[in-house]
UniProtKB/Swiss-Prot annotation:
Organism name: Streptococcus equi subsp. zooepidemicus (strain MGCS10565)
A GO cellular-component term linked to this record: cytoplasm
Keywords for this protein: Cytoplasm, Hydrolase, Manganese, Metal-binding
Protein name in UniProt: Probable manganese-dependent inorganic pyrophosphatase
Binding site for Mn(2+) 1: 9, 13, 77
Subcellular compartments: Cytoplasm
Length: 311
């Protein structure tokens, strides 16, 4: 077997980078695998904050597994092929560690697969360290903590599992940080949107979902001021229309999430706005609507869209 590439999803967030980096370390230590952690995109500002804080270099970015000489891959923080590497159907998936729905995915051979309904893939990787009696280095503990904080908005998201609270406390101790203090600093680092172009903003954290024959792009940006983001609405809509035309998305749903008050504004464009309105039981006005208490794409947006689209 050639070298195994380990990576998270496209447009990697902190959990994608953290879980893949940590699993790469674990794979070498516990399973004696010849792995290399890579990424399917550059780290965002939140992730860059975590990497810098714990003195870790960002994984190198790749676009094709076969171009790297890899015939086998390990996926973390995703399993759906549209969210993975460009040639995912041309290589063998050796393993998966994820905490999302399982969809748009199949393999020719059996594989290692660990999927749990917890707050982050990082939570699962930490559990694997403990199960295999591998000590967690300080930098890796810090990254795993960062992945958990990011995906659960500092344990406030409804995706937070009861076990995640204990995991966060243990990882914070191993990383030598104060959970609340470090967590808020990291999250705020990811809300600096002023320097982003509209095209960059809608691609910071975006995933494509195949819903009943429709390619639906669901993106999320975190902020401390929704109104400030909506001041750029016209330019954001222009960027959305451009990417829909170039990539063939039927619909685009952007979550603008207030990390302080735990609410979101939904900005949506596309061919199936009736289904979007049905999904969230609201009426879009000028292409947007307020969604109280919504902070999780995984739990509060994608399942509702999936049901409404009849996928």
């Amino acid at each position: 077997m050639s070298k195994l590439l380990v990576f998270g999803h496209q447009n990697p967030d902190t959990d994608a980078i953290a879980s893949s980096y940590a699993f790469d370390y674990l794979a070498k230590k516990a399973f004696d695998l010849d792995t290399e952690v890579v990424a399917l995109g550059d780290p965002n500002e939140e992730t860059a904050f975590a990497l810098d804080y714990f003195g870790v270099s960002a994984p190198r970015v790749v676009t094709s597994a076969k171009a790297e000489g890899a015939s086998h891959v390990i996926l973390t923080d995703h399993n759906e092929f549209p969210q993975s590497i460009s040639d995912i159907r041309e290589v063998e998936v050796y393993g998966i560690v994820d905490h999302h729905r399982v969809a748009n995915f199949e393999t020719a051979n059996p594989l290692y697969m660990r999927v749990e309904p917890v707050g982050s893939a990082s939570s699962i990787v930490y559990r694997l360290f403990k199960e295999n009696r591998v000590d967690v280095p300080k930098d890796i503990a810090g990254l795993l903590l960062s992945g958990l904080i990011s995906d659960t908005l500092l344990l406030k998201s409804p995706t937070t599992h009861a076990s995640d609270h204990r995991v966060a406390v243990e990882l914070a101790e191993l990383a030598g940080v104060k959970l609340e203090e470090y967590g808020m600093a990291m999250l705020k680092a990811g809300t600096n949107l002023a320097s982003k172009s509209e095209a960059e903003l809608i691609d910071i954290d975006a995933k494509t979902f195949e819903l009943n024959g429709n390619a639906v792009r669901v993106a999320q940006v975190n902020t401390v001021d929704i109104a400030e983001v909506l001041e750029r609405k016209e330019a954001i809509e222009a960027a959305i229309k451009e990417v829909m035309a170039s990539e063939g998305y039927s619909d685009f749903v952007l979550m603008i999430t207030d990390i302080v008050n735990s609410n979101s504004e939904i900005l949506a464009l596309g061919a199936n706005m009736d289904k979007v309105e049905t999904a969230f039981d609201f009426k879009l006005e000028d292409n947007h609507a307020f969604l109280a208490g919504a902070v999780s794409r995984k739990k509060q947006v994608v399942p509702q869209l999936t049901e409404s689209f009849g996928a």
